[in-house]
Amino acid sequence: MNKYNFGKIYKIYSVSANLYYYGSTIQSIPMRMTTHMRDYRRYKNKGLAPRCSSYKVLDCPDWKVELVEEYCAETKYDLEKREGEFQKNNVCVNKNIAGNGKRKIKT
């Protein structure tokens, strides 16, 4: 088994604002959210340009995170490709579609 066999697709969302962000990880969801929140706090506290489109959702007071799917991938590319399917097929704030080789901007 490799670490990508334990892949997860998750969404961060705000129902009141109708905003959704899709991501993937091999970490636990709480551990991944720790990183999202650390980066978000740096963005807010230092007035930096947003690095991640999840910040739009994290700005909402009612945001939540949810496991969408456990995904047994062979490689990072496989996991990102699956993440990209959710990004393409759902309304979301993600600017980049994962798993396209080169970063593709969502239109």
Where are the regions a protein language model picked out?
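Structure-specific nucleic-acid interaction/processing domains
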Residues: 1-107
